[in-house]
């Protein structure tokens, strides 16, 4: 090996050593507080080294990417669905589609176990599993004309597993959408500032869509500046309106009202043309997403804050107040999207491969965008770990866990305001005492002061992770840019997350509608027509109706639906990732590259162990701490049967809990059947092709890139 080659690797070796040293500090320092900077530097080093070496190994050895091969976008260039797109524009488009609420919420919830377990899983998971899955699916789909995950399973393994996979993907999509919507509802309930700001984004996006289409076509920079100025104005005026004696109470809505508004919004937006609301919303969201995360990272570099949360808390045994479940397997399910997420397999097949200009871009987009998303998750974990742990637990523990009943903040503007303020003080004192007794000392004054700082009546009962992240963002941005108060930055954070999530809700409902039309089209061919308005309305109504039902159940559930839906969301999401990795393994076997299947088999096996174990516990555990579905249902049925002095409301609440648990149990069993039947068919396929010495995969024939090169579009 010549010296030139060796010298080329020296900077990377140094970077690797720096990363390893920072990780060692994060992992091994005990008892003293350390700076959040260690985590940021360690993560960036890990991402860069993994991208430089591991993703290159996969691209060159496992996939053998071919720069001379024409992609589906080049072959079918129709200016509509198939468009060869600039790799940086496509990176932004793909990142906006995959980075929903998962990387924001999961890590915040996982912080109840301390910052260390989450950090290690986010780094190891993304390098070995998450980015591999995204890259693999994108590669396979781009060699099959941009086929969707279900279609590829049908082609490579047969029609039965194909239909099962389509059905499974659709079910998982419904759960993901319900969870995303629930997070928006929790963030906007009883918050007039949030409601005004988030509602303003709809006319802003519509205006941007019309501006780009008719007034000044193609002026992306111009319209983005206008959009951002209008966004900032809407945050500022939201604060003015929230403190207005008339408009404040008028825009304070209960969670059920917001639920119905969201369902209506999603239904309409999924039927509107893409250019009108979805595309401009994506632009706004991508600017905001990458801007805020980079801003947060720079803020942490400037402020060098210390991590207040311990490296590991006492809750690794599964007794935590936010969610139940021990470190293994539940940490690996709570943090889905930053480490590995099956939802991405639905984006990496279907949409993104139809826009790929050159096959070699798949590494940058498939592997690279997932690393970026993992960084978003790391920043969320850091934001949750630099605020006071006592405040973190007070905000995220459901009221029942704190032993309190929240007063009706709805009447804050009315004549009962003094009574409600007094009740709020009592409740806060009780909550502070409870959290302090767990070893995370906090005073009622600190909790009330935080609420006052951020311009909200209270910070209690703010589960779902979004408000905690917004407080973390507000802490950092307010210290770096003190001219705007904490309230502005907090609502900026909430808006950032709601936009993040609404983008996913819009896009998800739209692809959910296509999936449902695909499924139903097998029985009623007319419904397959995506350009028919009637079929579109039926598909959208079915999709929105299903996630809307789960969302409503979650909102009215006194135990907080996110608690029951979140583990299901994590488990189903990881199962879908396992299915995608099984497909990757089958394709490698059929391509006669069996020596490389460890790349997909190792993460697939790990995900299957985690998800099956977690589902087994959630279904059959009789440990009251675990809140197993069947156990909880039987407990509440018993309470209803034996309860003599129960009010009608209590009985209705208990019946809700019983229905929720049976729904979740039914869905869990369905997922197990879906995943294991696909593994069975994968195994069957392997047995069928193992003795053939020719390739048996269904790759489309090689077409060379046209001689004049490819005309690349820089906007999509």
UniProtKB/Swiss-Prot annotation:
Pfam families, per this entry?
CstA (PF02554)
Superkingdom in the source lineage: Bacteria
How this chain assembles, per its entry, is: Interacts with BtsS and YpdA.
Q: Which Gene Ontology CC terms are recorded?
A: plasma membrane
Instruction: Give me the ranges of the annotated region Disordered.
Output: 696-716
Q: Which residues lie on this side of the membrane: Periplasmic?
A: 27-30, 110-119, 185-191, 244-257, 304-326, 396-484, 553-568, 618-668
Does the keyword field hold ATP-binding? no
GO BP term, example: plasma membrane pyruvate transport
Reaction catalysis annotation = pyruvate(out) + H(+)(out) = pyruvate(in) + H(+)(in)
Induction description: Strongly induced at the onset of the stationary-growth phase. Expression is dependent on the BtsS/BtsR two-component regulatory system, and on cAMP and the cAMP receptor protein (CRP). Repressed by LeuO. Monocistronic operon. Regulated at post-transcriptional level by CsrA.
Q: What is the similarity comment for this entry?
A: Belongs to the peptide transporter carbon starvation (CstA) (TC 2.A.114) family.
What the entry lists under PANTHER family is as follows:
INNER MEMBRANE PEPTIDE TRANSPORTER, PYRUVATE_PROTON SYMPORTER BTST
Designated name of the protein? Pyruvate/proton symporter BtsT
Keyword field contains Transmembrane helix: yes
């Amino acid at each position: 090996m010549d010296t030139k080659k060796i010298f080329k690797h020296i900077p990377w070796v140094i970077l690797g050593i720096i990363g390893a040293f920072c990780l060692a500090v994060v992992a091994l320092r005990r008892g003293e507080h350390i700076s959040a900077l260690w985590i940021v530097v360690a993560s960036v080093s890990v991402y860069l080294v993994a991208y430089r070496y591991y993703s290159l190994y996969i691209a060159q050895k496992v996939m053998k990417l071919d720069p001379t091969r024409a992609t589906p976008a080049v072959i079918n260039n129709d200016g509509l669905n198939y468009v060869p797109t600039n790799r940086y524009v496509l990176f932004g488009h793909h990142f906006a589609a995959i980075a929903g609420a998962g990387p924001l919420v999961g890590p915040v919830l996982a912080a109840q176990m301390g910052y260390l377990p989450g950090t290690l899983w986010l780094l190891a998971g993304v390098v070995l599993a998450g980015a591999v899955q995204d890259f693999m699916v994108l590669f396979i789909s781009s060699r099959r004309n941009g086929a969707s995950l279900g279609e590829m399973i049908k082609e490579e393994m047969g029609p039965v597993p194909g239909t099962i996979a389509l059905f499974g993907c659709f079910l998982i999509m419904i759960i993901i959408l319900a969870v995303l919507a629930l997070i928006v509802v929790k963030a906007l309930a009883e918050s007039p500032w949030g409601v005004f700001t988030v509602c303003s984004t709809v006319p802003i996006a519509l205006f941007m869509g019309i501006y780009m289409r008719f007034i000044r076509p193609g002026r992306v920079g111009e319209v983005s500046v206008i959009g951002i100025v209008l966004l900032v104005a809407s945050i500022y005026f939201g604060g003015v309106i929230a403190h207005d004696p008339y408009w404040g109470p008028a825009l304070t809505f209960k969670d059920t009202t917001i639920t119905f508004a969201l369902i209506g919004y999603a239904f309409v937006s999924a039927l509107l043309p893409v250019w009108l609301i979805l595309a401009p919303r994506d632009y706004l969201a991508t600017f905001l997403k990458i801007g805020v995360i980079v801003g947060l990272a720079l803020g942490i570099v400037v402020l060098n804050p210390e991590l207040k949360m311990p490296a590991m808390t006492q809750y690794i045994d599964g007794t935590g107040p936010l969610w139940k479940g021990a470190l293994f397997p539940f940490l690996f399910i709570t943090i889905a999207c930053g480490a590995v997420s099956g939802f991405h397999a639905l984006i990496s097949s279907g949409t993104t491969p139809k826009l790929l200009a050159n096959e070699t871009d798949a590494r940058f987009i498939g592997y690279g965008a997932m690393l970026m998303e993992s960084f978003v998750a790391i920043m969320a974990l850091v934001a949750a770990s630099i605020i006071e742990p006592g405040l973190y637990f007070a905000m995220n523990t459901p009221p029942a866990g704190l032993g309190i009943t929240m007063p009706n903040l709805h009447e804050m503007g009315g004549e009962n305001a003094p009574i409600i303020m007094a009740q709020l003080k009592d409740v806060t004192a009780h909550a502070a005492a409870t959290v302090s007794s767990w070893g995370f000392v906090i005073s009622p004054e600190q909790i009330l002061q935080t609420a006052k700082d951020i311009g909200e009546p209270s910070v209690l009962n703010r589960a779902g992770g979004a408000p905690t992240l917004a407080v973390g963002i507000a802490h950092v941005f307010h210290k770096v840019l003190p001219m705007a108060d904490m309230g502005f930055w907090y609502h900026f954070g909430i808006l950032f997350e709601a936009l993040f999530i609404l983008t996913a809700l819009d896009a998800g409902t739209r692809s959910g509608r296509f999936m449902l039309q695909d499924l139903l089209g097998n029985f009623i061919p007319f419904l397959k027509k995506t350009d028919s308005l009637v079929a579109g309305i039926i598909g959208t109504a079915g999709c929105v109706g299903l996630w809307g039902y789960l969302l409503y159940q979650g909102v009215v559930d006194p135990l907080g639906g996110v608690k029951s839906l979140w583990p299901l969301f994590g488990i189903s999401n990881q199962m879908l990732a396992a299915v995608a990795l099984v497909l990757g393994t089958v394709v490698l076997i059929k391509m006669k590259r069996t020596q490389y299947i460890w790349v997909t088999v190792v993460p697939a096996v790990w995900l299957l162990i985690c998800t099956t174990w977690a589902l087994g516990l959630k279904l059959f555990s009789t440990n009251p701490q675990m809140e197993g579905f069947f156990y909880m249902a039987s407990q509440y049925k018993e309470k209803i049967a034996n309860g003599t002095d129960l009010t009608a409301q209590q009985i209705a609440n208990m019946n809700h809990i019983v229905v929720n648990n049976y729904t979740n149990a039914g869905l869990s069993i369905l997922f197990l059947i879906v995943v294991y039947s696909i593994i069975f068919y994968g195994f069957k396929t392997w047995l069928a092709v193992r003795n053939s010495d020719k390739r048996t995969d269904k790759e489309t024939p090689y077409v060379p890139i046209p001689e004049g090169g490819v005309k690349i579009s820089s906007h999509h």
